[in-house]
């Protein structure tokens, strides 16, 4: 079995670099808030009316999840970010890159395993 622990994907906002992690907690929060399966993640960027709000929520959630993981792993205290902070660092020049980085973080956070699920696929 390979390493199932999600790894942080780096993103730069302003002068600061942050990690983003898709943990089970983050996936659960996303599915609950948007009432979608995680496989439908790209749908959150399709509606021009909600795209920005969804992007800010996802980015803050994933950055804060990485901050919490770093604290668990190292004890380092790093302040959380909020959606307003994230929104100040997203513009038309970097929005597409940020969306792609979020999707890459999802891919990086998905465990790679050579084993099949013992009870078939789960929802």
Model regions and ranges:
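Charged interaction scaffolds used for protein-protein
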Residues: 1-13, 17, 36-49, 71-123
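Short, surface-exposed, low-complexity cationic segments
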Residues: 24-41
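Short capping micro-motif at the N-terminus of alpha-helices
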Residues: 20-22
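Short, hydrophobic/amphipathic alpha-helical patches that form generic packing surfaces
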Residues: 54-65, 100-104
